[in-house]
């Protein structure tokens, strides 16, 4: 459980208990259900990263909605976009082992996460990881519901494959940029699990 889950679930749960004691069952039950859903949303299950040293794992749970050629900082590469619904785990994980070379927060808009312009224009954290095999970048992108992106790591920190690095609240999108040296193994429409699903492999 992510610590924010207790903070957001406590008010509706406590108020729900009080209302149930006062025999306001309908409203009390609704608040208890809301509090339970918040606890479910902020769940943080244990994940075991694959032992494959050439693996690139998904940074997030969700559905692959786009795979496109896209340069980054003048370098050729491909982008995998993953949509997180409110039912998915919202903790993001390191796609590769390495050192975080940059964390750039970019303020922006709050378009729906499925819109193509969300990748470029929405509020986001851009996290760059320098791994022994090459550099990789992924974005935590806010949406029209998810208006807070949290990165728990700082530039200069080392991360293990599949290690927790941050979270997006209440559904949004994560983009993963891969250099040509990484062979993409997933297709559009595939459901992926953060820290465990191998989405690419270093060649």
Model segments located where?
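Contiguous, well-folded functional domains in the mature portion of proteins
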Residues: 1-203
């Amino acid at each position: 459980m992510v610590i924010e889950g207790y903070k957001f679930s406590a008010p509706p749960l406590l108020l729900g208990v009080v209302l149930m004691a006062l025999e306001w069952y309908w409203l009390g039950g609704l608040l208890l259900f809301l509090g339970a859903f918040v606890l479910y949303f902020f769940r943080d299950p244990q994940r075991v990263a694959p032992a494959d040293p050439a693996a690139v794992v998904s940074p997030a749970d969700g559905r692959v909605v786009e795979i496109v050629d896209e340069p980054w900082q003048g370098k050729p590469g491909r982008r995998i976009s993953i949509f997180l619904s409110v039912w998915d785990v919202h903790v993001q994980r390191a796609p590769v082992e390495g050192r975080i070379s940059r964390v750039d927060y970019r303020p922006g808009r709050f378009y729906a996460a499925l819109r193509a312009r969300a990748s470029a224009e929405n509020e986001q954290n851009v996290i760059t990881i320098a791994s022994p095999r090459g550099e990789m970048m992924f974005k935590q992108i806010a949406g029209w519901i998810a208006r807070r992106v949290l990165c728990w790591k700082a530039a200069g920190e080392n991360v293990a494959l599949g290690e927790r690095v941050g979270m997006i609240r209440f559904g949004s999108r994560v983009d993963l940029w891969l250099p040509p040296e990484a062979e993409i193994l997933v297709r559009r429409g595939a459901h992926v699990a953060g820290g465990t699903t191998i989405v690419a492999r270093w060649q």
